[in-house]
Amino acid sequence: MSQKVAKEGPRLSKNQKFSEHFSIHCCPPFTFLNSKREIVDRKYSICKSGCFYQKKEEDWICCACQKTSRRATSPQKPKHQPAASPVVVRAPPAKPKSPPRPAKPRSPPIPAKPRSPSRTERQPRPRPEVRPPPAKQKPPQKSKQPARSSPLRGPGTSRGGSPTRAPRFW
């Protein structure tokens, strides 16, 4: 819904019929239904939270945020600038909006209790008599075969050594 309104800008499309439910958020005059006639009357305006203004003499009070806005704003009072561009609200809404919750003052965080006492405070549990498991006898390992080349002989001609370094047995 908000995407469609953002695309269309401040005016409603012609196929949407005007009703008092289509109205503006706390903002300056607004044009409905491509009529090019700005609605100045606050009767058709609502606040950001979606509630209508009620007229009390010359003051207009927003039902939701209880802000009072005068038709002729005095220079002493700072003007309420809307954060975003005017947004059209469809009514009746599909889901009823819950009223905004009042902000609760934050209490200091409660330190979390440790789940178990520290090891120094904890008494050691009496353990049952612990016996080491019976040692399994390992099968005797086979002795490794000696290396094929004797360290005394050095590399032979067949093993990549030079023929001059090979021992001479002939």
Curated annotation (Swiss-Prot):
Where composition is biased (Low complexity), the residues are 82-92, 138-151
Q: Name the predominant localization.
A: cytoplasm
Q: Which Pfam families match?
A: FYVE_2
Positions of region (Disordered): 69-170
Taxonomy, superkingdom: Eukaryota
Keywords assigned by UniProt?
Cytoplasm, Phosphoprotein, Repeat
Q: Where is the composition biased (Basic and acidic residues)?
A: 118-130
Q: Name one GO biological process term.
A: nervous system development
Q: Does the entry feature the keyword Phosphoprotein, yes or no?
A: yes
User: What tissue specificity is annotated for this entry?
Assistant: Expressed predominantly in oligodendrocytes, in CNS myelin of the cerebrum and spinal cord. No expression seen in sciatic nerve.
Question: Where does this protein have compositionally biased stretches of type Pro residues?
Answer: 93-114
Stretch list, region 3 X 9 AA approximate tandem repeats: 93-119
Q: What does this protein do?
A: May play a role in compacting or stabilizing the myelin sheath, possibly by binding the negatively charged acidic phospholipids of the cytoplasmic membrane.
Q: What is this protein called?
A: Myelin-associated oligodendrocyte basic protein
**Which source organism?**
Rattus norvegicus (Rat)
Recorded name of the encoding gene:
Mobp
